A protein has these predicted regions:
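Glycan-processing catalytic domains of CAZymes
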Residues: 1-181
Length: 181
């Protein structure tokens, strides 16, 4: 299958940005490495930057483009260096665009480290489990622990004037088993 050319009728990214602009909305473009090709992990960040550069070249002038979102759902402090590089690459195109990531809330140090990245604007925190039918998940990630990490994370980003979002994941698998069916 051939890739759609920017501006062509098959260009879904361009279409989404044009529709967003028409309705007064903005959008973050999701960026990650090219998962259609095998590559060592050490090359993933350079692949991500290459894709981001291509997206900026194609869509950087679109009024609805608000920024870039790294959808790799990392956890732990190892994610910090990747986000620092990702955000710096995005801001190299335009200091005014937004950057975002969605880490798991499972390391209290991660909240502070991500908040310290000046170029990171939005942190979308998520728990491995925030609401689950699975008893093993509730034992592993009790609601109180998720609440504590969410509070810590929101506090860390508030001090640095960042946008903090969190979401609840509702899992529907095994519900019949737990409902007694």
């Amino acid at each position: 299958r051939k890739a759609a050319a920017a501006g062509s009728p098959e260009d879904r990214v361009g279409l989404a940005l044009k529709l967003a602009a028409e309705y007064g909305l903005t959008a973050l473009l999701s960026v990650s490495w090219d998962m259609t090709h095998e590559m060592p992990y050490s090359e993933c960040l350079s692949s991500t930057k290459k894709i981001m550069n291509e997206l900026w070249t194609l869509y950087g002038n679109e009024p609805a483009l608000a920024g870039f979102y790294n959808y790799q759902e990392g956890s732990g402090t190892y994610l910090v260096w990747q986000m620092r590089e990702f955000c710096a690459a995005a801001k190299s195109h335009d200091r005014g665009i937004l950057t975002a990531c969605a880490p798991y809330i499972d390391d209290p140090l991660l909240a502070g480290y991500l908040a310290a990245i000046d170029e990171l604007d939005i942190v979308i925190y998520q728990g491995a489990v925030m609401a689950s039918y699975r008893k093993d998940n509730r034992r592993c990630f009790p609601y109180r622990r998720v609440k504590d990490f969410a509070s810590l994370s929101a506090g860390a980003t508030r001090v640095k004037n960042k946008i903090t979002l969190s979401h609840v994941e509702l899992f529907g698998y095994l519900e019949k088993q737990y409902a007694g069916h």
